[in-house]
Amino acid sequence: MNVRAAAALTLAAALAACGPPEPDPAPKPAPVKAAPPSEVKVSSPTLDAVRARGRLNCGVHQGLAGFAYPDQRGVWRGFDVEICRAIATAVLGDAQAVNFVPLAATERLNALQEKRVDVLSRNTSWTFSRDASLGFDFPAVTYFDGQGFLARRSLNLASADELSGARICVQAGTVTEQNLAEYFREREVKYTPVVVASEEEAREKYQAEACDAFTADISALASARSILNDPASHVILPTVISKEPLGPVVRQDDAVWADIVRWTVFAIVLAEEAGLTSKTVEQARETATRASVQRLLGKRDNLGAMLGLKPDWAFQVIRQVGAYNEIFDRNLGPRSSLRLTRGFNRLWTADPPGLLFAPPMR
């Protein structure tokens, strides 16, 4: 190396040494710490309104066997009805503190938007547009369904694709109507839609042979078939043309209320996971040693305070209403007239597994 090159290198090293110091590394963010439950401040206009009223206003179907219907004494029964009762229990401590508001499909979302009801529990599908643009939240799925077709067994149909030229009853103002049109358009199958105002009217027209088939959620078809004159003469075709995640709906302007509804549903699922029932939960609250069960039943950590609820809110829900499997079995399953199988509504831990899942309560 010549003298000039060596001098240049020496000068460069000197300049580098005199340059600005390296900046200090950015400070690490402090870890996120949850405030103790008792110190969490809860603000929910809906919760305040329900407590001031002393009753939950819950929107339900006008009459759908298995899901929502008044019995001969005028007492509301059904799967969706019991979800209402579970929410009322969580918030008010009383499963009977519910005003049931029967709503047609065309008015159900308006009723929620206008605050005529606090929550909608009316076999309503969770869709992108309802969630993203209409100002609603879907806290949890209570029933995984799909759209199907009811037809007379005498037609010997193997699938819905054989309904070319058929008259098909469908309820107005529903996702069902849109699914029907898209399905047959994509398959270039011609049909005649018989659009009616309610599922009851669709069933009556189908019974009177004013239409050849009836399309709705499969659970609704099972409900309709159970009250036809001769249920065995009708079959639900194996074709399923959509996925319909059904569950309660709330307004998007109250995050705490959405959490209350969400975790009420999760509580009845967690109860089934833990093997708890309305008959065993009182003893379990006294004897449970598993931390997850103690938290669920309010024996430790007081998680309910984070939602403005009492420590034993989930315990009361399970004691007064039941675990998910109890609610399903008596309204839709083997103890009901519908005798539906659990299908996708099995627990994720079942064999074979279903889609029913609840995050950990901790």
What are the language-model segments listed below?
Residues L303-R362:
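C-terminal functional modules
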Residues G19, P29-K41, E82-R85, T89-V91, ...:
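Extended ligand-binding regions for polar small-molecule ligands
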Residues M1-A7:
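Bacterial N-terminal signal peptides that target proteins for export
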Residues N57-G66, W76-V91, S125, D145-E201:
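Bilobed "Venus flytrap"/periplasmic-binding protein-like clamshell domains
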